[in-house]
Amino acid sequence: MANLKYYDVILKPIVTEKSMNSMSEKKYSFSVHPEATKTQVKEAVEKMFAGTKVASVNTMNLEGKNRRRGNTSGKTSKTKKAIVQLTADSAEIEIFTGL
């Protein structure tokens, strides 16, 4: 298990059409550190965004995509994605409002 601080766990929010539609169910998508656990993601969200209470966390490891540039082929880096479900009485996350 990685020794990560809560501000190192969440890298950036994922803003796609699918993630925006799931916000009505209080589900938010984040790109997280590859070694972060579900408990670390839960603690990071509750500490970084005041008034939020996490009900559940779903994580998935995404493989890198194959890319070519001329005759050279390679792969993009692997990433980890977390979908955080907030409780009904929880406050909304401010960075997603107004999008």
From Swiss-Prot:
Belongs to the universal ribosomal protein uL23 family. PANTHER family: 60S RIBOSOMAL PROTEIN L23A. One of its GO terms (biological process) is translation. Keywords: Ribonucleoprotein, Ribosomal protein, RNA-binding, rRNA-binding. This is Large ribosomal subunit protein uL23. GO terms for molecular function: rRNA binding; structural constituent of ribosome. It comes from the Bacteria. The gene is rplW. Part of the 50S ribosomal subunit. Contacts protein L29, and trigger factor when it is bound to the ribosome. InterPro entries: Nucleotide-bd_a/b_plait_sf, Ribosomal_uL23-like, Ribosomal_uL23/eL15/eS24_sf. The keyword Signal does not apply. The keyword Transmembrane helix does not apply. It holds the Pfam family Ribosomal_L23. One of the early assembly proteins it binds 23S rRNA. One of the proteins that surrounds the polypeptide exit tunnel on the outside of the ribosome. Forms the main docking site for trigger factor binding to the ribosome. GO terms for cellular component: ribonucleoprotein complex; ribosome.
